[in-house]
Regions:
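Short, contiguous pre-domain boundary segments
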Residues: 1-6, 79-80
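Short, contiguous alpha-helical
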Residues: 7, 11-15, 19-22, 32-76, ...
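Acidic/histidine-rich alpha-helical segments that form the ligand environment
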Residues: 24, 79-117, 126-142
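A very general structural signal that marks isolated residues within well-ordered alpha-helical segments
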Residues: 27, 53, 98, 105, ...
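Surface-exposed helix-capping loop/turn segments at secondary-structure junctions
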Residues: 27-34, 102-112, 152-159
Length: 165
């Protein structure tokens, strides 16, 4: 049996990261989609939207290396009906599928290419592989950690079981 390629590993890891995020987003109780841990924090729905934006950013960045880093925007999303949140979570799932497909099909020479990287104050060049892993996948893991904290706080506030954290 052949060893998996770095592309297969990236795609598999990408799907695992997204599924873990989706598990947490799906456990949010109805009516809590706009909840935020502090008044200036991103809400739960804002976090989901931000992850969709970071996937779209990655696609643009690979097409145009001059694309600048983006940041999350508290208050960007306002969920009025649960169906809106369900659509948002479906979009998050779909962008995760597109991201995994991108990773599965990306060429070795593209992954090793060095492009402009303005993340984390570096303002220098990084490999495309590093941007995929650090600026996208690790970024999602960071926000999933925040979401896990949101869920724990909601559980404490409501005194009711809220999904697996």
């Amino acid at each position: 049996m052949e060893s998996p390629t770095q592309q297969q590993n990236l795609a598999e890891f990408s799907l695992a990261v997204r599924e873990s995020s989706l598990k947490r987003f799906r456990s949010i109780p109805p009516g809590m989609e706009n909840w935020r841990i502090t008044p200036k924090s991103m809400s739960i729905a804002d976090l989901a939207e931000h992850l969709i934006h970071t996937d779209r950013w990655l696609f643009r960045k690979l097409d145009d290396p001059t694309v600048q880093a983006i940041s999350g925007n508290p208050g960007e999303v306002n969920i009025v009906m649960r169906e809106q949140y369900d659509v948002l979570i479906t979009q998050l799932f779909e962008s995760g599928q597109r991201r995994a497909e991108l990773f599965r099909n990306i060429k070795d020479e593209v992954l090793s290419k060095r492009i402009f990287d303005d993340h984390y104050g570096s303002g220098s060049e990084s490999s495309v592989w590093w941007i995929c892993v650090r600026a996208n996948l690790d970024h999602e893991i960071h926000h999933r950690g925040a979401l896990a904290v949101y869920l724990r706080v909601l559980k404490e506030i409501n005194g009711a079981p809220i999904g697996a954290v």
